[in-house]
Amino acid sequence: VTGVDMEDIGARLVDRFGPGAEGWLADVPALAARLASRWGFVVGELFESGASSVVLRCSWPDGTPAVLKLSPDGALLAKQVEMLRVFAPSGRVPAVLAADADAGAMVLEEILPGTAAEDLPPSSLPQRWGELLTALHSVAPPADWPLRLRGRFEESFARIGKRLADPAISARIGEDTWQRAIERCEELLDTQTTNVLLHGDLHLGNVLDGGASRGLIAIDPKACVGDPCFDAVDYVVGGAGYEGVEARCRLVADACGLDGDRLYAWSRVVAPMFVISFLTYGGPEQAIGELLALAS
């Protein structure tokens, strides 16, 4: 692990969890060693790490390639374990090999070849996405599952909406556009007739190639109950600046057996969120223009 990698990870963790994350990060090598001795795996190199965790490659005692995921937020990790176990019958999420919420640790099988969906041939993707959704959505929501798509959107609109205070963003997206997205969202939520257990964060970076026998595998679920179209909307909106959202929407709706009108309506709801992300982190102007028109 290079110092630069750890510095970058440290900055992201501090951004998310506050200055205490630095002390936690310093203890990661010792924590990984303790868990390796307890669970019998061999620790490998640093794997890609997100804003809330550090991920290391490891080899399970039976030789299975695996990843060790560590987070200062044990409760968050426990929730992730629960969601992966709920979706396990679908065969379309990584298997949980071990977990300890108190230690903020879990070991998952590594998905191989593991190519992200955004790097797979675009022509076969709609069909494969359809197969993935069919498998995921066939899992019955647990009777007492507390998370709903409505709550997910309330949180997203509140959190992302704060960025409208940034002049660079308010110059492109006004309060009226944002309010229109909220109203469109309310209308779609009020007219949901089919409710399934959604992955809830199914963008092209959260779907990996599990090879010919397994198909596409979804990682990092934020499971909630709601309209099946929601698990295709990020993929559809990703058509902005390429073949176009409308064309991709038709293709994906057909391949996934979804209501094309509702899927397109959902894409208009999330379009301004994508614009804010592009303006914040950089994105093609052509896509921004198309998404602004979609949100109008």
Task: Give the positions of each predicted feature.
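Juxta-kinase regulatory segment immediately upstream of eukaryotic protein kinase catalytic domains
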Residues: 1-44
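A glycine-centered beta->alpha junction motif in the catalytic cores
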Residues: 61, 73, 89-90, 104-122, ...
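ATP/Mg2+ or Mg2+-diphosphate-binding catalytic cores
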Residues: 16-18, 166-168, 172, 247, ...
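A conserved alpha-helical element in kinase catalytic cores
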Residues: 29, 51, 62-107, 111-135, ...
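Active-site acidic catalytic loop and adjacent metal/ATP-binding pocket
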Residues: 47-48, 54-59, 67-68, 96, ...
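An alpha-helical support segment within catalytic cores of ATP-dependent transferases
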Residues: 24-35, 138-200, 210-212
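Active-site Asp-x-Gly
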Residues: 209-262
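Generic structural marker for isolated residues within well-ordered, non-membrane alpha-helices
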Residues: 10, 32, 84, 133, ...
